[in-house]
């Protein structure tokens, strides 16, 4: 699906019957979460709440509530087609040298397309049609959701945070939740390894005590949003990648407050600064684990201007016990990860992040085993390859005869090919999501790998079992007889 901006995307979804409008009053406090949660569990449509209680700005929910809509947002017609996106990223991450002149000519269009997708800066943009500044800056005018009964305050969930580090020419885009603590202040919850936090840390080291420019875009086009959660190579900006997905350059405009560039078609933009001496305790909030998280201290983002389109749309979501929207995103992005991993580890035949595993905490891998101990090499490789897998707690590795997307097959491999002492790998004192309260120390815990492959000589001294399989000729004969049998 090709589209210009979020509004164009919504028009096309509505034409497909994949967006429904709600014209009765619904409260952003809890009620929208309950409706979106039920819709998501039914693989239902995106929803536009046209009359949020106490507000005039409509709320968009459940936009990425099915893997198919994620694929459409990435410019593809099906979830399986996302493998092609992964192949492109794998090539851009580590391009192979051309094997000859013909191969070089065949690769030239791809490289040319990437170079041609540098963002296009506009002098003026729809996202700056309306400007709030000074005393007019009031987050209370926006229909920001409170998702769960125990949440401490309204929470911005789909904010596309724009930062730039002092050592980088390109900007970083990231999705970080933001707790509202005042009409012009939110808490910026970014974990230490995320791009925005790293940019901020580098800035503070070079310019100690100086305010750090930040912008948050709400209601950007889907390609730009999804570019921020995809493992884009460091040599490629998220804006460039969004252009590749969309098939057209990402249009940006300079903020009115500082020099950061934001998506020109964004519905709402928050502009301001983080002051290094201002921190606040964030949470508790219900999150993607299905629990309320611990409180933690993060920087405060002070908003100096809010700009927006005429008749803006506020894009929101909730996180909770899987499945939620992040889990659905994980299902779709899983198809992007497979070619990336296969480029680095050619023995991998499939890779699966079960949505019940809180998006990334459990991974199952199938492989063509080549030597004793091979499964452990794959485990360590996955943990260290992409930042997205830094917090993966459990990795199960099977042979390629197992359909790892069928849990019955995985359990069979685990119960018949695993000796707990020999085949369990425990790694202590590794980075863990601080939301994981099961770890003994916040942000630091252990990981476990389970080798559920057939064991080779050197891994066992016993004769290994041979799987039962019916004679092929008998199966063929019964296939022909089946329609004649009385069942």
UniProtKB/Swiss-Prot annotation:
Record key words, sorted: Cell membrane, Decarboxylase, Flavoprotein, FMN, Lyase, Manganese, Membrane, Metal-binding, Ubiquinone biosynthesis
Catalysed conversion reaction: a 4-hydroxy-3-(all-trans-polyprenyl)benzoate + H(+) = a 2-(all-trans-polyprenyl)phenol + CO2
Pathway it works in: Cofactor biosynthesis; ubiquinone biosynthesis
InterPro entries: UbiD, UbiD-like_C, UbiD-like_N, UbiD_bacteria, UbiD_Rift_dom
EC number, as in UniProt: 4.1.1.98
GO MF assignments: 3-octaprenyl-4-hydroxybenzoate carboxy-lyase activity; metal ion binding
UniProt keyword annotation of Lipoprotein present: no
Disulfide cross-links: none
Membrane topology (UniProt): Peripheral membrane protein
Principal location class: membrane
Broad enzyme group: lyase
Residue sites binding prenylated FMN per the record: 175-177, 189-191, 194-195
Cofactor binding note of this UniProt entry: Binds 1 prenylated FMN per subunit.
Assembly mode: Homohexamer.
PANTHER family reported in the protein's UniProt record: 3-OCTAPRENYL-4-HYDROXYBENZOATE CARBOXY-LYASE-RELATED (PTHR30108), FERULIC ACID DECARBOXYLASE 1 (PTHR30108:SF17)
Function, in words: Catalyzes the decarboxylation of 3-octaprenyl-4-hydroxy benzoate to 2-octaprenylphenol, an intermediate step in ubiquinone biosynthesis.
Record-stated family: Belongs to the UbiD family.
Identification of the protein by name: 3-octaprenyl-4-hydroxybenzoate carboxy-lyase
Organism: Nitrosomonas europaea (strain ATCC 19718 / CIP 103999 / KCTC 2705 / NBRC 14298)
């Amino acid at each position: 699906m090709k589209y210009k901006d979020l509004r164009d995307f919504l028009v096309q979804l509505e034409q497909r019957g994949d967006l429904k409008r709600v014209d009765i009053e619904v409260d952003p406090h809890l009620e929208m979460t309950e409706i979106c949660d039920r819709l998501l569990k039914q693989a239902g449509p995106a929803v536009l709440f046209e009359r949020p209680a106490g507000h005039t700005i409509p709320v968009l929910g459940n936009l990425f509530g099915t893997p198919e809509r994620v694929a459409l947002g990435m410019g593809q017609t099906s979830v399986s087609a996302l493998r092609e996106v992964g192949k492109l990223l794998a090539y851009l991450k580590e391009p192979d040298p051309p094997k000859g002149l013909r191969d070089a000519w065949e690769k030239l269009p791809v490289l040319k397309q990437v170079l041609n997708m540098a963002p296009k800066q506009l002098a003026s943009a729809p996202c700056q049609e309306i400007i709030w500044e000074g005393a007019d800056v009031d987050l209370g005018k926006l229909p920001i959701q409170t998702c769960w009964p125990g949440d401490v305050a309204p929470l911005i969930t789909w904010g596309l945070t724009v930062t730039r580090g002092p050592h980088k020419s390109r900007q970083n885009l990231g999705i970080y939740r933001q707790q509202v603590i005042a009409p012009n202040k939110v808490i910026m919850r970014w974990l230490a390894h995320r791009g925005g936090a790293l940019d901020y840390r580098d800035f503070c080291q070079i310019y100690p005590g100086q305010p750090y420019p930040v912008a948050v875009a709400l209601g950007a086009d889907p390609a730009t949003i999804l570019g921020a959660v995809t493992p884009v190579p460091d040599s490629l900006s998220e804006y460039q990648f969004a252009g590749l997905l969309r098939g057209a350059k990402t249009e940006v405009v300079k903020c009115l407050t500082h020099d950061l560039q934001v998506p020109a078609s964004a519905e709402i933009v928050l502009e301001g600064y983080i002051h290094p001496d201002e921190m606040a305790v964030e949470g508790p909030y219900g999150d993607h684990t299905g629990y309320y998280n611990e409180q933690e201290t993060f920087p405060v983002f002070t908003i100096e201007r809010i700009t927006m389109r005429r008749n803006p749309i506020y894009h929101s979501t909730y996180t909770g016990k899987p499945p939620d929207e992040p889990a659905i995103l994980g299902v779709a992005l899983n198809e992007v990860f497979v070619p990336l991993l296969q480029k680095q580890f050619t023995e991998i035949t499939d890779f699966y992040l079960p949505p019940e595993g809180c998006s990334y905490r459990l991974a199952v891998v199938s492989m063509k085993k080549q030597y004793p101990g091979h499964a452990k090499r794959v485990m360590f490789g996955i943990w260290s390859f992409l930042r997205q897998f830094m917090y993966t707690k459990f990795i199960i590795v099977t042979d390629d005869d197992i359909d790892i997307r069928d849990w019955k097959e995985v359990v069979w491999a685990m119960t018949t090919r695993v000796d707990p002492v020999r085949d369990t790998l425990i790694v202590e004192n590794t980075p863990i999501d601080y939301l994981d309260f099961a770890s003994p120390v916040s942000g630091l815990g252990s990981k476990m790998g389970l080798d559920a492959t057939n064991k080779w000589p050197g891994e066992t001294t016993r004769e290994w079992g041979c799987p039962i399989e019916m004679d092929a000729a008998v199966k063929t004969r019964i296939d022909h007889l089946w329609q004649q049998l009385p069942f």
